[in-house]
C-alpha cells in the first residue's frame, strides 16, 4: 500500500517552510500573551517604568469589581446574539440565493458588499440611520409611535451594536454558506424532490446536515469575531454606553489600559478573556464537533 505522505529531499526543508509562520506566531501571538500574563501579576506604574510583583491580587480585585462583572455578562450576551443571529441570517440569505435561478449573480454581489466596509464605517453608517433627531429609520419608527434614542436606552444601544456587528459579518458567513450549498450534488437534491420532499424539507433533511462542517467552522469564527473584532463597532456607535450597557470585555480592556492607564488591571482582564475564549473553543471542539460528520 503506497503512502501519500510527502517526502522531502532535505530533512531541513519542512522546518524551513514552517519557520516564517512560526516566527509570526511567536512575535504576534505567544510573546504578547506572555507579556500580558507577566504584567497581570505585577503592579505597574502608568508609564511602565517600574513594577512590583503582587501575585494574584489583580485577579482578586477584578472579580470583586461590579463593573467588570457587568462587562463579563454583557460580553456573554452580546457574543451569543452576534454569533447566532449572524449565522441564522446569513444561512437564510444563502439558502434563498441558492434557491433563486434568475438574478442569483446580482444577489450574490449585493450580499458581499458589507464585507468591503470597515467595522467603524459600518457603525457610523447605522448611527446616521438610527440618529434620534434626523435618522431615516428613527423617523420611520416615530411614525408608528416608537421613540428611539440609543444614547439613553440601554436596550436600544445593545440592539444597535448587535445589528451593526451582524450586518458587517453577514458577507463572510454568506460566502461560506453559499459555497457549501452550491457544493451539494444536484443529483441528491433532484432525488429528494422526486421523492416528494418540498424545498423546506429538503433544506432541513438534506442540505443542513451536509453543510454541518462549514457551520461548525463559522461558529468558531463568529464567536472569536464577537469577542474581539467588534471593538470598532462599539467604540464608534456607543463608546460602551449608556451607563456601560454595551461595554464588553475587549472594550473594558481598552478603557482600563489606554484611558485609565491601569496596565496591570488591563493585562489581568486580557488574560481572563484569553482563557475564556480558549475554554469556549475547546468546549465547541469537544461537544459540538462530535456531532459533525465529515465526508
From Swiss-Prot:
InterPro entries reported for this sequence: MetI-like, MetI-like_sf, UgpAE/MalFG_permease
GO biological process, alphabetically ordered: transmembrane transport
Cytoplasmic side: 1-11, 102-109, 179-207, 284-295
Listed transmembrane segments: 12-32, 81-101, 110-130, 158-178, 208-228, 263-283
Pfam hit, one: BPD_transp_1
Gene3D superfamilies: MetI-like
SUPFAM superfamilies named in the record: MetI-like
GO cellular component: plasma membrane
Membrane topology designation: Multi-pass membrane protein
Localization per record: Cell inner membrane
Domain ABC transmembrane type-1, first and last residues per copy: 76-284
UniProtKB keywords: Cell inner membrane, Cell membrane, Membrane, Transmembrane, Transmembrane helix, Transport
Subunit structure as annotated in this protein's UniProt entry: The complex is composed of two ATP-binding proteins (UgpC), two transmembrane proteins (UgpA and UgpE) and a solute-binding protein (UgpB).
Family from the record: Belongs to the binding-protein-dependent transport system permease family. UgpAE subfamily.
Primary role: Part of the ABC transporter complex UgpBAEC involved in sn-glycerol-3-phosphate (G3P) import. Probably responsible for the translocation of the substrate across the membrane.
Name of the featured protein: sn-glycerol-3-phosphate transport system permease protein UgpA
The organism of origin for this protein: Salmonella typhi
Amino acid at each position: 500500500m503506497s503512502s501519500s505522505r510527502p517526502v522531502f529531499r532535505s530533512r531541513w526543508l519542512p522546518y524551513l517552510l514552517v519557520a516564517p509562520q512560526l516566527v509570526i506566531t511567536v512575535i504576534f501571538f505567544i510573546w504578547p500573551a506572555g507579556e500580558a500574563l507577566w504584567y497581570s501579576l505585577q503592579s505597574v506604574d502608568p508609564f511602565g517604568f517600574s513594577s512590583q510583583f503582587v501575585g494574584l491580587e489583580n485577579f482578586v480585585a477584578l472579580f470583586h469589581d461590579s463593573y467588570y462583572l457587568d462587562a463579563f455578562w454583557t460580553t456573554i450576551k452580546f457574543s451569543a446574539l452576534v454569533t447566532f443571529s449572524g449565522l441564522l441570517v446569513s444561512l437564510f440569505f444563502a439558502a434563498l440565493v441558492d434557491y433563486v435561478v434568475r438574478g442569483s449573480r446580482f444577489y450574490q454581489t449585493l450580499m458581499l458588499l458589507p464585507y468591503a466596509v470597515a467595522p467603524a464605517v459600518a457603525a457610523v453608517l447605522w448611527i446616521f440611520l438610527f440618529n434620534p433627531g434626523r435618522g431615516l429609520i428613527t423617523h420611520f419608527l416615530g411614525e408608528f409611535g416608537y421613540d428611539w434614542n440609543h444614547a439613553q436606552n440601554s436596550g436600544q444601544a445593545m440592539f444597535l451594536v448587535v445589528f451593526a456587528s451582524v450586518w458587517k459579518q453577514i458577507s463572510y458567513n454568506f460566502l461560506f454558506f453559499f459555497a457549501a450549498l452550491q457544493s451539494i450534488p444536484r443529483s441528491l437534491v433532484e432525488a429528494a424532490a422526486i421523492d416528494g420532499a418540498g424545498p423546506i424539507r429538503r433544506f432541513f433533511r438534506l442540505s443542513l446536515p451536509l453543510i454541518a462542517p462549514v457551520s461548525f467552522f463559522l461558529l468558531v469564527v463568529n464567536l472569536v469575531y464577537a469577542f474581539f473584532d467588534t471593538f470598532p463597532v462599539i467604540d464608534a456607535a456607543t463608546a460602551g454606553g449608556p451607563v456601560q450597557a454595551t461595554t464588553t470585555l475587549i472594550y473594558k480592556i481598552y478603557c482600563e489600559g489606554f484611558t485609565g492607564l491601569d496596565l496591570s488591571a488591563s493585562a489581568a482582564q486580557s488574560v481572563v478573556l484569553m482563557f475564556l475564549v480558549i475554554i469556549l473553543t475547546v468546549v465547541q471542539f469537544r461537544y459540538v464537533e462530535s456531532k459533525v460528520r465529515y465526508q
